[in-house]
Design a protein with these regions (language model features):
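Short amphipathic beta-strand/extended segments with alternating polar/hydrophobic composition
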Residues: 51-56, 184-186
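C-terminal segment of N-terminal export signals and the immediately downstream linker at the start
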Residues: 25-53
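A mature extracytoplasmic/lumenal domain signature
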Residues: 44-46, 55-57, 110-112, 144-146, ...
């Protein structure tokens, strides 16, 4: 009789394990398929405006936040707003992860630049490209307070995705979504 009970216990235990295992994939799948919130915080040093928001929802972008970011990154000279490449924000998120940061304020030096503003800057400085990625909404000049500029540059460069300009005297890093390339400015 004890032999039968022992066998019955074994089958009941095995049934419990099988039942538990059948529930596990859904739990694991739910945990894996729910992405972490992708938060970014910005301060435009020219206007003093700040924005801290979730730029992506699930696997896509948060369009309401993208519109706010477009406004924050507008041309400081003309106040013109232009659609920024959302991939820039994914890159910012990856840069913060590379630096071991989480939702740390990113100081914006320059985002979108109208063709008029860019032409005026190009006339004053050889360092401004006549066909800058800023005109297309594909570039941002920035720094992260408290993080050495060279370390920020290295974190952007590690992505091997787009352009990286290093401007130590001007205290900013240029990041864009154009072809992979690097340069050093003043």
């Amino acid at each position: 009789m004890s032999h039968i009970n022992h066998g019955r216990r074994k089958w009941l235990s095995l049934g419990g394990i099988v039942l538990g295992a059948s529930l596990l994939p859904n739990t694991v799948l739910a945990a894996v398929s729910t992405p972490k919130p992708r938060l970014l915080s910005f301060r435009n040093i020219n206007t003093g405006e700040k924005l801290s928001a979730e730029f992506a929802l699930g696997r896509g972008f948060n369009n309401a936040t993208l519109r706010l970011l477009d406004h924050l990154l507008r041309d400081k000279r003309t106040n013109q707003v232009h659609r920024m490449d959302p991939n820039l924000f994914t890159k910012f998120y990856q840069v913060q992860q590379n630096l071991g940061l989480r939702n740390t304020e990113i100081q914006i030096i320059c985002g979108y630049r109208s063709a008029t503003s860019n032409a005026a800057m190009h006339r004053r400085s050889r360092g401004v490209a006549s066909n800058s990625y800023h005109i297309r909404g594909q570039a941002i000049d920035f720094r992260i307070d408290g993080i050495p500029l060279a370390k920020v540059r290295d974190a952007v460069d590690a992505l091997q995705n787009g352009g990286v300009g290093f401007y130590p005297r001007s205290n900013f890093v240029h990041m864009d979504t154009g072809p992979v390339r690097t340069w050093r400015g003043s």
